[in-house]
């Protein structure tokens, strides 16, 4: 059997030489050479003598030796590949961690053989066979790389080296030291830490930015919600205001409609008409409208020819009234100064009446003419255009006017009133504010015809007209069939304020108090005579306020500084205007013939 073993040893030696010559194994590697020559060293150590065991034992020993050799080869290959991997990682400055380096060493250790053959210039067929071996090797070591078993490595190293290179644990610690030295010497490891820190900082910054963006979005959403709520609240308030305005407009329209119906004799309370003995009929101009065609006074069927408002330019506001606001403006086509009266939302019938009356009075003395009627098509606002008048309130001029000036302007006013009455029209709102005086030109104009009405004898009219301080007694006791004499009472109140330096002369707080103020001057005898004549009566409240009084003497109301103005003919003229009974008052024509105007009335005699 010793011969057979020698023959087997020679064959093994030849195989090793062939493997080395072919380049499959590097004999200079410190890890592979002990594995290749371990059997030879063992044979020489034993002196070439073998025990005379049975053939079966020899076969078993040979098999065990072969297995050990295979294990040693595998372990040496692993060690060799680890070394090559360490070298390759040092050259490439790998940035992987410790565990990744170990797994990469195991996964790449089997390409050492193919790389060695390539350096020797071998053919592609050999490379393909080597690749097949590497595939098998990879399959075998894939299970090993999943779990790094240090005990298996210890056994393989100790068995392969045969004790010549020390124990397996010492080899393992050497490898781990090399790996640790490599990792400590590798600068990419510290770079990885810096990169990780930078990435963490970037992530923190991104998170902060995201938080800031979210906060900004939340703030924007809150602001948008607040703005939406504010807009909704504003819209709600605007809607409430518009609804209130509409309700007020409806109420005003209903009141105006009721007043208009009362004024036209359509609705009159029956208890007020009971006991009427005599109907009031004007003693002048009573049949003017009856002698005219219906189209002359029928403002209900009158159609207004509205023109474009763009012709006029508004400059500034100069006044306001109950039913309108007044602005100064310019006629763009002629560059003339104008006055634009912007009408508030009122009953359409009232606007038609005012325009119709102004057309009827066009060209009259001291009556402001209507230039144009315009309408804004977008807003539907209606306006009346008049020539510009340098308006000065007559009350502002009272201290600059002398006796002659007062006579002159009252006479000019009577001209306008008489012309109005001659056209069958009652002004119904004569007061200082509706009299425009340009004293430098000595020009007077009667303005504001919004309450004017056509007169028809025996017709009932609305008693809610004229300003309180200039209301005649017939309006205060609800006498609906009044006539032109209403304007003459208002003129008397205005004249009393001028010559007696007391405006308003009858300064009542309400309608009943206004009647009481009149009674204190004119007494109760003439009042009761007036009421009895026309079958009128006082209300319970009026009866409780009014007590029997004598008529006052006009001279007691004259201030000493106005002796030159309040002359006897002026007092007589005033006394004939302020009468309870409308039939006893002077008409406009009669007033102009009064001796008070003897210096001016030659033209009308």
Swiss-Prot record:
Q: Where is this region: Disordered?
A: 54-170
Q: Membrane-spanning regions, if any?
A: 5-25
The domain of life is Eukaryota
Could you tell me where the Polar residues compositional bias lies? Answer: 144-155
Which residues does the record list as glycosylated? Answer: 53, 92-93, 97, 101, 127, 280, 390, 601
Would the keyword ATP-binding be found if you checked this record's keyword annotation? yes
Compositional bias of kind Low complexity: 54-81, 89-104
Give, as one word, the top-level EC class.
transferase
GO cellular component terms, A-Z: cytosol; membrane; nucleus; protein kinase CK2 complex
Q: Which residues form the active site?
A: 429
Record's compositionally biased regions (Basic residues):
105-123
List of residues binding ATP: 318-326, 341
Read off the CDD domains from this record: STKc_CK2_alpha
Catalytic reactions of this protein:
L-seryl-[protein] + ATP = O-phospho-L-seryl-[protein] + ADP + H(+); L-threonyl-[protein] + ATP = O-phospho-L-threonyl-[protein] + ADP + H(+)
Query: What is the protein's species of origin?
Result: Dictyostelium discoideum (Social amoeba)
This protein is called what?
Probable serine/threonine-protein kinase DDB_G0286481
GO: which molecular function terms? ATP binding; protein serine kinase activity; protein serine/threonine kinase activity
Among the GO biological process terms of this entry, one is: regulation of cell cycle
Q: Can you give the residue ranges of the Protein kinase domain?
A: 312-597
**Which family does the UniProt entry place this protein in?**
Belongs to the protein kinase superfamily. CMGC Ser/Thr protein kinase family.
User: Where would one find coiled-coil regions in this protein?
Assistant: none
UniProt EC number? 2.7.11.1
Q: How does it sit in the membrane?
A: Single-pass membrane protein
Coarsely, its chief localization is: membrane
